[in-house]
Amino acid sequence: MSKLGSALGQKYEENRLAVLTRTFDLGGHTFKVKVPSVQEIEAIYNYYKNPNEEEVEKAYQVLVKDLKTVEGIVEKDNDIVIEDRSMRETARNKHILQYRITEYIKFLIGENGETLNHITYEDVESEFPLAIQLTLVEKINEVISPEYKEVRSK
């Protein structure tokens, strides 16, 4: 128990999970979301600045594997450029987006209270189309945001 938790008392400790949980509805389902710590959010944002280059390279190789025979490509500085667009930068952006989606989905709480810390982007992609993935991230971001205003009907 933390110093603050001790000061707030036993009742707080019993209800701590509820205090740190918010909900939103989508498609008739109520999703529970763990409000992340500042450190968890900072770790995600820091990853954007410095993603795993091996993962970016894997994404790049998948993007360009069939492009060598396409007309109009330019090979330049260890990159393939199509219509002035760097495939390496595209791969980086794709990887960062998938990372963000996965990390935000991990804030969801399973129906029986289990964490989703073990999921991968492949798990997310097999369950939800990209449009739903982006909607989930948007909804999660709304409820964990400091500007979030909880509305309860009494």
Where is each model-derived feature located?
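Extended acidic low-complexity intrinsically disordered regions
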Residues: S2-L17
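Short, surface-exposed, charged amphipathic helix/loop patches that serve as local interaction elements
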Residues: H29, K34-K154
